[in-house]
Amino acid sequence: MKKPNIVFVFGDQWRAQATGYAGNPTVKTPHLDRFATESINLTQAVSGYPVCSPARASLLTGQFPLTHGVFVNDVHLDNSAVSIAQAFKQGGYQTSYIGKWHVDGHGRSNYIPPERRQGFADWKVLECTHNYNQSAYYSGNSDQKLFWDGYDAIDQTKAAEDY
């Protein structure tokens, strides 16, 4: 049996109510609407710590901030923390992370070396930015800063589709 593709979408400042599939008649999200019908959709999930870095560290490790130690933004998630990427790799999956990382804690625009990527193999990432148009990122193991062509979310989605 072929293993299913598993895709997580971590949105910043994005409420579920801001989608068509959740019933908002004003917001048009046809691709997300279709994605939601073909996916597991957690409609009653909450964050135990609704701050970017702690929430991302929890999503990556399955641990509460008290365990993984990331209590505020811009704090490094310990390299020894077992991540979802490592678990999927053990299950025979290839892993990719595209977009905002925000658990490195070594500067918002600095290159993140492989040993601080929690096991993700494919990589198109910037630690953190709030510029969503033509922002910088690093790809693979290169420390050369690249730039998305247009609106980041569109280019990042294309990169995920290409992967």
Regions found by a protein language model. Name each.
Residues 1-163:
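Formylglycine-dependent sulfatase
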